[in-house]
Amino acid sequence: MRALWIVAVLLVGVEGSLFELGKMIWQETGKNPVKNYGLYGCNCGVGGRGEPLDATDRCCFVHKCCYKKLTDCDSKKDRYSYKWKNKAIVCGKNQPCMQEMCECDKAFAICLRENLDTYNKSFRYHLKPSCKKTSEQC
């Protein structure tokens, strides 16, 4: 549990209910979320933007788009509840916006798991200024 708290602290600046998001990624992928996704590609982590480099990076792009659609909540501060039940994420009974945030994070963690085979270690600490602008909109 202490390691997950450290993960949450290291993710400061990344949108969302950080502690829960970090746990979801760890549970779904078995990977350390900060080390493996904190600066991955063009769209993961703080300041991410640009044309996705691969399917893993596209997960981050879609996640940011999902957050842009949230209503009446602060994706940087509000916290939601969820459970890890039978190796599946189950969002708890939350207020509407926090429920939406939980669903965004759940879809993101599942997307990362489903695209583990595209994960490219050379994109792990990718320099954002080298990312090409994308015409793709949310």
UniProtKB/Swiss-Prot annotation:
Positions marked as site (Hydrophobic membrane-disruption site (MDiS)): 127
Site (Important residue of the cationic membrane-docking site (MDoS)): 121, 124
Site positions per UniProt: Cationic membrane-docking site (MDoS): 128, 133
Disulfide bonds: 42-131, 44-60, 59-111, 65-138, 66-104, 73-97, 91-102
Domain of life: Eukaryota
Compartment(s) of residence: Secreted
Alphabetically ordered keywords of this record: Disulfide bond, Myotoxin, Secreted, Signal, Toxin
Protein name: Basic phospholipase A2 homolog acutohaemolysin
